[in-house]
């Protein structure tokens, strides 16, 4: 009996058919498509423990396009009920509906800056990066630049990943400023990786003469990753006044590694 009820509920839930007024055996049946209660069920499915329910609900909401923007924004505003999975899937579904929507773009930018939820801030940065790569998407907003100075290391790292994935080569000054002051190793690692992806080798070689030790070390690591420095250049860098840069430039077997001692 439980199995029969669950099966009937599944078909009713996903719009196969429903008896009019719930009367079994009735000839007239109503197909359920974009009714309000179905939207609520789809939103609930975004927070389901079953990945297939989340994926199917997201695809259906994206298919319905701009009509779902309001309900999804309401779902994100409902802080009391939001779990991480629902928050993540609702945000990404909203971002995928219209990558070129300036209103949504501004909303995600404000979330990066102001939201209480760390997860929602991180997801918003990822969505903005995805939109920047989309053929019809919008470029990264200045909110991403501000995120590079955030007190939370995970936000700084995600902002760097957004710059890297979007392929922005006009943000070098911001990345270099971060390299100059960054103390978190994971963020520093991400920063020189972003530098490597967005700046050509010759430009990074010029950064080896930068007055800021963190910039020199970041540029050096990115060039070592590509084996792009001649032995004589490494010998000069081995005399650097900053210990980590000098140590990284000294030949060793096995190699020193990607960051330093």
Language model segments and positions:
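Amphipathic alpha-helical scaffolding segments comprising HEAT/armadillo-like alpha-solenoid repeats
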Residues: 35-44, 65-78, 99-113, 134-149, ...
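Beta-propeller domains with acidic blade repeats across secreted/periplasmic ectodomains
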Residues: 1-33, 37-40
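C-terminal substrate/ligand-recognition segments
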Residues: 4-5, 35, 46-66, 85-88, ...
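Long internal repeat-built scaffold domains in very large eukaryotic proteins
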Residues: 211-213, 221-261
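Boundary/linker elements of alpha-helical solenoid repeat scaffolds
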Residues: 21-28, 51-58, 85-91, 122-125, ...
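Structural signature of alpha-helical solenoid repeat scaffolds
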Residues: 62, 92-95, 129, 164, ...
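Alpha-helix N-cap/helix-start positions at coil->helix boundaries
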Residues: 51-52, 81-85, 117-119, 153-154, ...
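Alpha-solenoid helical repeat scaffolds
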Residues: 41, 56, 71, 86-89, ...
């Amino acid at each position: 009996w439980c199995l029969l009820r669950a099966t009937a509920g599944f078909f009713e839930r996903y719009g196969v058919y429903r008896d009019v007024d719930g009367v079994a055996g009735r000839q007239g049946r109503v197909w359920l498509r974009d009714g309000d209660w179905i939207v609520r069920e789809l939103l609930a499915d975004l927070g389901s423990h079953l990945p297939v329910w989340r994926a199917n609900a997201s695809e259906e909401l994206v298919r319905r396009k701009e009509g779902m923007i309001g309900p999804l924004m309401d779902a994100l505003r409902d802080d009391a009920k939001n779990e991480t999975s629902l928050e993540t899937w609702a945000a990404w579904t909203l971002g995928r509906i219209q990558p070129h929507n300036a209103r949504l773009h501004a909303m995600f930018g404000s979330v990066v800056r102001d939201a209480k939820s760390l997860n929602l801030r991180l997801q918003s940065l990822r969505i903005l990066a995805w939109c920047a790569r989309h053929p019809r998407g919008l470029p990264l907003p200045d909110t991403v630049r501000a995120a590079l100075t955030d007190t939370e290391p995970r936000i700084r790292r995600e902002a760097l990943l957004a710059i890297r994935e979007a392929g922005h080569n006009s943000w070098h000054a911001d990345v270099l400023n971060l390299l100059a002051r960054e103390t978190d190793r994971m963020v520093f690692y991400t920063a020189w990786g972003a530098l490597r992806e967005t700046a050509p080798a010759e430009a990074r070689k010029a950064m080896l003469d930068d007055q800021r030790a963190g910039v020199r070390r970041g540029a050096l690591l990115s060039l070592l990753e590509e084996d792009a420095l001649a032995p004589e250049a490494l010998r000069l860098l081995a005399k650097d006044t900053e210990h980590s840069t000098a140590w990284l430039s000294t030949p060793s077997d096995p190699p020193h590694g990607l960051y330093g001692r």
